[in-house]
From Swiss-Prot:
This is Protein TIC 214. There is a partial copy of the N-terminus (positions 1-343) of ycf1 in the inverted repeat (BAF50598). It is found in: Plastid, Chloroplast inner membrane. Its main location: plastid. Part of the Tic complex. It comes from Lobularia maritima. The keyword Plastid applies. The keyword Transmembrane applies. Involved in protein precursor import into chloroplasts. May be part of an intermediate translocation complex acting as a protein-conducting channel at the inner envelope. The chain crosses the membrane at residues 19-39, 68-88, 91-111, 133-153, 176-196, 227-247. Keywords: Chloroplast, Membrane, Plastid, Plastid inner membrane, Protein transport, Transmembrane, Transmembrane helix, Transport. One of its GO terms (cellular component) is chloroplast inner membrane.
Length: 1775
């Protein structure tokens, strides 16, 4: 039953698979997919369904649907029908046909009177609406689809058509599938429209219901046709906009440009004799005409130089001669017929090429060119060629059959009848073929098993492995042929044989030595170029008549040309098929065989030769330019760097009019992006899609897909409107956390911004048309105006004013300075020429005018007032930094760099103001010398003033008390003493509890005086009487109320009356009280006013003295500061000195404040707070009112009462709820005081230590036990933290705190190659040089390289973060000897590493070395280098952890290095001018011949010591250089032979190293450019000695940089690291074995480098017995035999049983396992996968599948699939 069920399931599955793979289902699927290819035709279809109504509307719907379906049916038929496919599949055909119809339709809908739109009958012929609707839907369906392009579907259809048998069924089923999808789509659209009409909620929102918009809606409905036409026009223009117009392009010049060149004759003559008749490569009629026209007229166009190349074809005599003597040339007749047809169809040919040449109208798109090839390849030629061949014993069609072989086979069949024979039956051929293969297979199997058996016997592996078959000279001597000449080898190992030069004279000895002993094919001797007379002498045994020169190709004639003499035929054939001549004595025959042509395939190329714009610029003479440039190069300009004029005799000058100048020039490229891309002028090109340029100056075009990863917000980026999101975020966070910190841009960032602005300005001037002409003329006029008008006028005005002010004029000094100013003409980049010499084409290319020693107007020259020592030093420093040159701008201003910001001129009036200030100061110092004494005795004066003040106040209070006592003895009111006593009674407690407070002393004495006046008895009696009266009145009132309540009920009016009575009574009571107390109130106010007036009078001298002291203090501070050299500035905003305040004692720096704040008593703190001035207390009032509510639980009640009585805060607002005891009770109080207001750094120290734990986690290495030094340093670091972290005096040592804070943050965030100088962390303070050096010394970061016992550095130790890929390098300042860290981004707008912006919780990723780190988890953007080849990721990670693996650079070069230890001496520099300045002066005094070869001796600076670079080239690269040098020498023979020495030197240098990218160091870059610019200017001068010293003093010339020696020591420059040569990727001539070794060597361990130290012995085990691991047993065989063995096994795979196939193999299974799996533990699944993948390649023929891809162009061999073969095999274990 189970078997039956499985059988049913198997049948169902197979049935389903058959249905799915059937032609009908696949066709329905592809047809349904084409429904989603929505194009412009859907606009017409929807318009007809939506807008049209009525009877005519239904007709339009039907016609639109019919036309739509008919158009799609034509598209499907074109898949099967080839002519229709050629017509519709070529897009330009549809474009040419659709454009007129589109314009017609557009104007028809927009023009009112073009057709009559009135009501017409159905039978009228003028009503073309329905027909036009049908045509619209039919034609626009044939267009290329708009939303979803149909190229993908067309490719899928073509692939399925290639492997489908029933093609018509496939086409019909796909059309049916499309029809079903279209019906469903239209039904869905209809349902949506009905739903919109029925849904009231949607219709209510539409404006149609309102009467206000009915007119607009009707207008909209009437103009829908126009709207649809506009939409259609926009879509079609968008489609057509991607293709430029083919009409307005540059045409070729016809045959004159296509023919007549040397290479064209080579193409026409070296191909097969009849290529156009049999080859598919000559399909195009126009190309046939071109080739035939060249061949017919070939003899007329032969030049003297072309004779050698053309004689190959014409000496072989294609013209065959009959026995009658009539010459016949079938090709010639064919050419004549074609010529007549061309004359007949004179107009048809250009029209056809214009409309139907869909690939290129006029010229190709690219022009492939190098040193060997100077003609572009015809990209119309395809390498697909179908022909029948025998495969697996049967005839099959091959689509990669060689076309030349097929044509040759057809020629042999037609021309030689004896070669044709009857074909054998297919079965017989198959059986013979299978038997041969079986025999081969058996032999291979036997050999394979024998090798395995010998391997079991423990033979050496070298003897068992099969070696490649080589060709030997003799059987006895095992001497192999060289690899180049070995026929059994193929590929790169064969090498390249250098051709002999065409006109080289070859002697007989050379022939005997080289060719005398070699074997030569006779067929080559007959068919190739041979001297006919000497050849006939060697063939005397044959009949000369039968083998004459005219008839030597007669055997290839037509079948009707029969030969009479059969014996002669037999002799000829015997001679032809005796392949080898063994007689070496036939010297005449051998001599003529020197000119063998190399057998290769000639690629069809265009005949014309084009040059680029760059070649036109680089051309030396105008005569060398043959034609106008035809290739658009990148925008560039030619800059002349050096001009040399040869001196001649006077007699020679008379004869010759002008001397020619030899120039050395370079090409300057624009900073703009290059969109020309070496495209041929006039060729059709497609626009670059998916690239956007939103900046005016942008280095590279970026895709909008990566727009979210760019920091810019807008699509434009001007410097004034740019918006940096991340920069703004940093600023906000930094301001939020640190309000006191100022944000400023560093100098490096500012310089980058200015550099970018300069480049933008330079590019705008260079790009705007006629801008350079305007700018150059304005600059010249500005220099003339400045030198001749403006500056002399200023000199006249200045000296005339001096005369008016009775001062001596300075005419001579000013004119001398003006004469010193020089206006040097420079190129656009700033290269100096001379003062009078203008650069070539300066109007169009641009000019710069450099002003040397610019003139600045000064009020006087020799100052009469001598400056101090400090001022003189400052002046000397300014002169060192000052550059005595500038560049002139268009506005007449000065800049330091071309197109830079304007330079600030030294002010004319500033020295005048300074001189006036000095004189005023000198005048002030004389009368105020006494103030110095007051300054010294300031404390004494303050104490005396304070004591006087206290004495006056005490006396005043005493007098005031006496006066009050005398006044109180008079009339005393009744109620007055009683009130005073009550007040005294309430305040006695507070006075007794706070006797220490001095502010209450006045009140206390006054109260005591009043208490002595009254006696206690009187007061008691009065109080008793008042109480009895009050009690009586209350009793009477209660009785009255009871009587009224019992008699009458209360009314509403009565209540109002009672309330009003009560309010009136209280008012009356208060008035009486006021009247009673008014006397005392007035008296109290008078007393307070008198006291205030008296105190003010007393304070007048105090205020005046205080102001006097303050003014004198400021004056003395200024005076003392300016006279003392090392004095520090005193803060002008210092707080005022209060005599009463005692806070000054708390703020003394000598005392230490501990962290334990509990030691302070509350009474002491609040007492000191109460002693503060009112201004300070007022600031704290709001804080105290709020904070005491929180901390009221901890504050004593007496202190609260005191503050409440003083009026600082209201006691009733206190919250008496319990507060959490964990809250720091003093924290909020102490924040309000300056001395306790701790900075954020200190609070961070007192807080948690999360960030410190993060530091410790980051610094942990995976294997902690590797180093002892690391752990030792860690312990020191931890102990240091424990000792210094909670120091008591750390708050009072700000320098130490800041230093510690920098150290911790540097350890966290700062890396060696960080891109920012400002640390992006919590503090945000720039690093101090001292702190960095202290940090490096203290924590021994410098000593990391001194780890001796660790053999290899683990890169996971370095937990640094990188934001961009930058080139950073350490540099040393020779003056300060402090280490800095400097980073520079050298590539302009280069996006090296993509970082996702805007992600929440953004993390700093781990250091991604080479993009291969395995620990990156959250990184969204993966490394794209290993996206396609993930297998290499594991290789790279193991390589990083085990550096002894064979390095990857071995795949590129073979380094042959020689390490030499050179002792380098760096002499100390003394003096202002360097020690080698004398050599530099001597250098300029040399002759002209010595100037070119002079340089400097070997010397090295401190910076150069650290950058020593060893560079070496491999032997293979040197061979490549020699080959290219030979080619260049040949190429430049036609150019000028007489060159100057400088040109020869530069050509030789560039010829040797032109294949290398040359770059220099950044430090070397800035200095060398400045020195070179000055050097170019100095070379032109006659006497440069005067300017050399000044330029050396100013620092423009650094003599250490210039190399003063007779030869250019490039090796020393390389070692010093100034110059670095990076090799360009070139094709290396490596052996096949070397490539295999390098490929396998990546995953293997090198024995020499894997030296195991003692500490690693316990961790790993190495198997010494097993030398290698076999991937597959087949690896014993050679690769060629292995492939053959696999293919032979896989033949007849279905017929063989498993037992038969493995019968021989099963016997040896145990032995095989012992060989392979002894002491190995490989997984079984992995082994099965290995076996599967090893046999997958030959079984399923992946070459054929890969060729079906769209990348099949130009792939004739399987080299492109080599990487696929490599990646099919998995990586194995390394033991």
């Amino acid at each position: 039953m189970m078997v039956f069920q499985s059988f049913i399931l198997g049948n169902l599955v197979s049935l389903c698979m058959k249905i799915i793979n059937s032609v009908v289902v696949v066709g329905l699927y592809y047809g349904f997919l084409t429904t989603f290819s929505i194009g412009p035709s859907y606009l017409f279809l929807l318009r007809a369904r939506v807008m049209d109504e009525g009877e005519e509307g239904t007709e339009k719907k039907v016609s639109a649907t019919t036309g739509f379906i008919a158009g799609q049916l034509m598209m499907f038929i074109s898949i099967y029908y080839a002519p229709l496919h050629l017509a519709l599949g070529r897009p330009h055909t549809i474009t040419v046909l659709a454009l007129p119809y589109l314009l017609f339709h557009f104007f028809w809908n927009n023009h009112k009177h073009f057709f009559d739109y009135g009501s017409t009958t159905r039978n009228e012929m003028r009503n073309l609406r329905i027909q036009c609707v049908f045509l619209n839907n039919l034609i626009f369906q044939l267009f290329n689809h708009f939303i979803l392009p149909s190229s993908m579907l067309a490719r899928l259809v073509n692939i399925y058509m290639f492997r489908c048998n029933n093609k018509m069924l496939f086409v019909t089923s796909s059309f049916v599938g499309w029809l079903i999808g279209h019906i469903l789509f239209m039904k869905w659209v209809g349902l949506v429209l009905v739903w919109i009409q029925q849904n009231n909620s949607i219709r209510s929102n539409v404006l149609i219901r309102s009467n206000k918009y009915k007119f607009l809606v009707s207008e909209l409905r009437n103009s829908m046709a126009r709207i649809f036409s506009i939409l259609l026009f926009i879509t079609c223009v968008y489609y057509l906009g991607r293709i430029p117009s083919p009409i307005f392009t540059k045409k070729l010049k016809g045959t004159s440009e296509r023919g007549g060149t040397k290479q064209d004759q080579e193409v026409s003559t070296e191909e097969a004799p009849f290529p156009s008749l049999f080859s598919e490569e000559r399909e195009d009629l126009d190309k046939i005409d071109e080739m035939e026209q060249i061949r017919v007229n070939g003899k007329e166009k032969i030049n003297k130089d072309d004779e050698f190349h053309v004689r190959t074809y014409y000496n072989s005599k294609t013209v065959s001669e009959n026995r009658d003597g009539n010459k016949e040339n079938s090709n010639l007749e064919f050419f004549k017929i074609k010529k007549k047809e061309d004359c007949f169809l004179g107009f048809a040919k250009p029209f056809v090429t214009l409309v139907f040449d869909y690939k290129r109208w006029n010229r190709p798109n690219r022009y492939i060119k190098n040193d060997k090839i100077e003609h572009t390849v015809r990209n119309e030629m395809s390498q697909y060629f179908f022909y029948t061949c025998q495969n697996d014993g049967k005839e099959q069609i091959s689509f990669t059959y060689p076309a030349n072989l097929s044509t040759f086979f057809e020629m042999m069949q037609k021309k030689i009848p004896p070669f044709t024979r009857e074909k054998a039956p297919s079965d017989q051929v198959f059986t013979c073929w299978s038997l041969i293969n079986e025999e081969k297979k058996e032999n291979l199997q036997n050999e394979f098993f024998n090798r395995i058996e010998t391997l079991d016997k423990e033979w050496s592996v070298e003897n068992i492995l099969e070696k490649t078959t080589r060709f030997c000279h003799n059987e006895t001597k095992t001497e192999y042929l060289p690899k180049i000449y070995d026929p059994f080898l193929h590929g790169i190992s064969r090498g390249r044989i250098k051709k002999l030069p065409p006109f080289q004279i070859i002697t007989e000895t050379y022939i005997k030595n080289n060719i005398g002993g070699s074997w030569i094919n006779k067929i080559h001797g007959i068919l190739l170029k041979i001297n006919s007379r000497k050849f006939e002498q060697t063939l005397e045994k044959f009949n000369r008549k039968s083998l004459s020169i005219e008839e030597k190709l007669s055997c290839f004639s037509e079948p009707q040309e029969e030969q009479n003499n059969s014996e002669e035929e037999i002799k000829i054939f015997k001679f032809l098929f005796n392949v080898v001549i063994t007689d070496n004595n036939e010297q005449t025959f051998i001599k003529n065989l020197i000119y063998f042509d190399e057998i290769n395939k000639k690629v069809p190329r265009w005949s014309y030769k084009l040059i680029s714009d760059l070649e036109e610029m680089e051309a030396e003479d105008e005569q060398s330019i043959l034609a106008e440039p035809g290739i658009r190069s990148r925008k560039a300009k030619r800059i002349v760097v050096f001009t040399e004029k040869e001196t001649h005799n006077e007699t020679f000058k008379e004869n010759q009019s002008s001397d020619e100048k030899e120039e050395i020039s370079f090409i300057r490229f624009s900073q703009q992006p290059d969109f020309r891309r070496e495209i041929i002028k006039g060729s059709m090109r497609s626009q670059r899609r998916k690239t956007v340029i939103w900046e005016f100056f942008q280095a590279k075009a970026h895709s909008p897909f990566f727009f979210d990863r760019i920091d810019k917000l807008f699509f434009f980026s001007f410097d004034s409107f740019s918006f940096d999101i991340w920069g703004l975020k940093k600023k906000i966070l930094r301001n939020f956390m640190w309000k006191n910190k100022t944000i400023y841009k560093t100098k490096a960032e500012q310089s980058k911004i200015e550099e970018k602005k300069r480049l933008q300005i330079a590019e705008t001037w260079d790009n705007v048309r006629f801008a350079q002409i305007i700018r150059s003329s304005v600059l010249v006029t500005q220099s003339i105006l400045r030198k001749n008008i403006i500056l002399p006028l200023l000199i006249i005005i200045k000296n005339s004013i001096r005369v008016l002010l009775f001062q001596i004029p300075e005419w001579s000094e000013d004119l001398k300075d003006l004469k010193r100013e020089m206006h040097v003409k420079c190129t656009y980049n700033g290269v100096q020429l001379s003062e009078k010499e203008f650069p070539r084409k300066w109007l169009t290319d641009g000019i710069q005018i450099k002003i040397i020693f610019p003139f600045y107007l000064k009020p006087w020259h020799n100052s009469k007032f001598q400056s101090s020592q400090k001022a003189q030093r400052k002046k000397a420093k300014d002169t060192e930094k000052k550059n005595d040159f500038c560049f002139l701008t268009v506005w007449g201003r000065e800049t330091e760099l071309p197109f830079g910001s304007a330079k600030k001129k030294p002010s004319f009036f500033e020295p005048i103001y300074k001189e006036l200030k000095k004189r005023i100061k000198k005048f002030k110092t004389k009368p105020f010398l006494v103030l110095r004494i007051f300054k010294e005795r300031e404390k004494f004066f303050l104490k005396v003033a304070k004591e006087m003040k206290n004495w006056i106040i005490k006396n005043f209070l005493f007098l005031k008390g006496k006066i009050k006592n005398l006044s109180k003895r008079n009339i005393i009111p009744v109620f007055g003493p009683r009130e005073i006593y009550e007040v005294n009674e309430t305040k006695n407690d507070s006075i007794m509890s706070n006797q220490m407070i001095e502010n209450l002393s006045v009140q206390k004495k006054s109260m005591e005086w009043t208490n002595s006046l009254l006696s206690e008895n009187k007061l008691k009696n009065l109080i008793d009487r008042i109480k009895t009266i009050r009690n009586q009145t209350e009793e009477i009132s209660k009785e009255k109320e009871n009587l009224t309540n019992s008699c009458n009920k209360p009314r509403y009016d009565s209540k109002i009356i009672e309330s009003s009575k009560k309010s009136w009574q209280t008012l009356k009571r208060k008035n009486t009280r006021l009247i009673r107390k008014s006397f005392f109130f007035i008296k109290f106010c008078i007393e307070q006013l008198s006291i205030a007036i008296f105190l003010g009078i007393i304070n007048i001298p105090r205020i005046t003295t205080q102001l006097f002291f303050e003014s004198t203090k400021t004056i003395l501070d200024k005076y003392i500061y300016k006279n003392e050299e090392n004095g520090k500035k005193i803060n002008k905003k210092k707080t005022t000195i209060y005599f009463i305040s005692t806070i000054k004692n708390l703020l003394s720096k000598k005392k230490k404040i501990s962290y334990d704040l509990c030691s302070l008593s509350q009474a002491y703190v609040f007492y000191k707070l109460s002693k503060m001035q009112v201004s300070n207390v007022s600031k704290l009032k709001a804080v105290l009112e709020y904070k005491i509510c929180i901390t009221s639980f901890f504050v004593k009640n007496k202190i609260k009462d005191f503050f409440q009585e003083q009026g600082i805060f209201d006691y009733e607002l206190k919250d008496k709820t319990f507060v959490n005891s964990e809250v720091n009770q003093w924290k909020n109080w102490l924040r309000s005081h300056s001395q306790y207001n701790l900075p954020q750094i200190a609070w961070a120290r007192l807080g948690t230590q999360k960030w410190k734990n993060k530091i410790n986690q980051d610094s942990i290495v995976l294997n902690r036990s590797l180093t002892k030094e690391d752990s030792y340093e860690k312990k020191i670091f931890d102990n240091y933290k424990k000792q210094n972290f909670f120091e008591a005096d750390s708050l009072l040592n700000p320098k130490h705190n800041v230093k510690k804070d920098y150290i911790y943050n540097l350890f966290c965030y700062k890396s060696i190659n960080s891109t920012e100088k400002n640390l992006d962390m919590a503090i945000g303070i720039a690093l101090d040089n001292y702190l960095v050096s202290c940090f490096l010394e203290k924590y021994n970061i410098r000593g990391r390289r001194k780890i001796g016992h660790r053999k290899y550095l683990d890169w996971r130790m370095l937990n640094f973060w990188f934001r961009k890929n930058v080139n950073s390098e350490p540099w040393v300042d020779t003056k300060s000897k402090k280490k800095y860290i400097k980073t520079q981004v050298q590539n302009y707008q280069r996006i090296e590493k993509i970082t996702k912006t805007g992600v929440a919780n953004e993390k700093n990723f781990f250091f991604d070395w080479m993009g291969m780190n395995e620990e990156i988890i959250n990184n969204r953007v993966t490394n794209l280098e290993f996206f396609f080849f993930p297998e290499f990721l594991l290789f790279s990670s193991t390589y990083k952890m085990k550096p002894w693996v064979i390095p990857i650079k071995l795949l590129l070069f073979n380094f042959n290095e020689k390490k030499n230890i050179n002792k380098k001496i760096t002499p100390n520099k003394k003096g202002f001018i360097p020690s080698n300045a004398k050599k530099f002066l001597e250098f300029f005094n040399l002759n002209k011949e010595e100037k070119e070869s002079a340089g400097q001796g070997e010397r090295e600076s401190d910076n150069e010591k650290k950058k020593n670079l060893e560079s070496a080239l491999s032997k293979q690269e040197k061979n490549i250089e020699e080959n290219y040098a030979e080619l260049k020498i040949k190429k430049h023979k036609t150019k000028k032979q007489h060159k100057s020495n400088t040109e020869v030197e530069i050509d030789s240098f560039m010829g040797r190293d032109s294949r290398f990218q040359m770059r220099w160091n950044s430090f070397f870059n800035k200095k060398i450019i400045t020195t070179l610019k000055v050097y170019c200017f100095l070379v032109r001068l006659k006497n440069p000695n005067e300017i050399i010293l000044s330029s050396i003093e100013r620092g423009e010339i650094n003599p250490d940089i210039l190399l003063i020696s007779k030869t250019l020591p490039f090796s020393q420059l390389l070692k010093k690291g100034m110059w670095v040569f990076e090799p360009v990727r070139l094709s290396l001539k490596n052996d096949g074995q070397l490539i295999i070794y390098r490929t396998i060597g990546i995953s293997l361990v090198h024995k020499k480098k894997n030296k195991i130290s003692k500490r690693y012995k316990k961790k790993s085990y190495i198997d010494k017995k097993n030398n290698c691991d076999f991937f597959v047993p087949e690896n014993i065989l050679s690769p060629k035999r292995r492939r053959e063995f696999r293919i032979l096994i896989c033949f007849n795979l279905k017929k063989k049983n498993a037992r038969d196939r493995n019968s021989r193999f099963d016997k040896n299974i145990p032995n095989l396992t012992t060989v392979l799996h002894k002491k190995k533990n490989l997984d079984k699944d992995k082994n099965n996968l290995i076996k599967l993948k090893s046999f997958l390649w030959p079984n399923f023929r992946l070459e054929d599948l890969a060729c079906m891809n769209r990348y099949w162009f130009n792939t004739t061999n399987g080299n492109h699939f080599g990487m696929i073969r490599i990646h099919m095999y998995t990586r194995f274990q390394i033991h």
